[in-house]
């Protein structure tokens, strides 16, 4: 079991929840693979390869789309350098539509830094929240 790896991932969720984005970015490797669903209706879709891209194209786009947004981790599965997190993405869009989507995040951590994050979402819930 890699407590340090799980702790790094837990810190991402804790700092995101507190709005401490710089602390989240501090544990991202300079070159990483952050993969979001490729669906056209998602403002943060695609693969992002730097902390700056994650900040702008993921966090920035989500915050521009939602009045309230949170990721809620429920279960952490430790697999050495990989941590699988089950949870939910929840929020209210600027149009007043609610999001409550099941999610699974697969993290890879090396030397205390996130080198990969692959996100799996209930895309129907996202589509409904974003498009009505």
Question: Where are the language model's segments positioned?
Answer:
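Short, low-complexity N-terminal intrinsically disordered segments enriched in polar/charged residues
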Residues: 1-30, 130-132
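Poly-acidic low-complexity segments
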Residues: 20, 33, 122-123
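Hydrophobic pocket/interface hotspot
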Residues: 9-12, 24-25, 32, 54-55, ...
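A beta-strand edge to alpha-helix "cap/lid" segment located at domain peripheries
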Residues: 1-4, 59-132
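A solvent-exposed, acidic/Ser-Thr-rich amphipathic alpha-helical stretch
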Residues: 23, 29-80
